[in-house]
Amino acid sequence: MQRSSVLRRLQEVAQEQWGLLTRRQIEKAGIGSTSLERLTAEGGLLERVANGVYRVIAAPIPDHLNLRAAWLQLAPDLPAWERTADQGVVSHRSAAAVYALGHLPADRHEFTLAKRRQTRRRDVRIHVRPLQDREWIGLRGLPVTRPSRIASDLLWDHEDPEAVARLIADAIRPVYDYPGTFADSLAPHAARFGLRKGDGLALLRWFLDMSGDPETDRWMDEARAHVDRTARATT
């Protein structure tokens, strides 16, 4: 394949990955180490943004650049559009940052995987927990846990309850997630807060009261209706 064709193919891949490419993808296209050095030299086509991840200089800089690069590192052979939750889902504080929920700083890149995986990066944290399909969505091209799952994950990590309360209200207000879904995800944590075991409604009320949002009563009505529907469907 001619060099011009190779570069064109790389640009096509990068277009679907926010202007980013992994070293593995570059090598699979037929570009060796020497050619890659030329491409990343001053005035070249690429710049290195993380170990084994490069950005096409002419492409717009994407939001959450470092998070996207860290996610690509998890499965460097696979293009973004072929990945599933098995290759890692953005979660915890990182997921909250993608939605712009709450105020917890995303000082590490956090991902949830079903199987253990090692990373040498100190700023990357891998959580090994089961993740159901309904607990994550595609957001801005990334697989990201839903806010109801984020809240539950943060509670498992013993995050500040006030921070979780703010995140919940921030998510329900623009309908990023639903009161009933939060009631479901909070249920396993109720006993730790002195409430009846499995009472996700009571814990949701506790968090919403803490947030002070004026829509609390309406949201609780929605959550109760959801819980009632679920109960009828399972009896």
Mark where each language-model region is:
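Short gly/ser-rich loop at a beta-strand->alpha-helix junction or flexible surface loop bordering the NTP-binding
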Residues: 2-9, 15-146, 153, 157-235
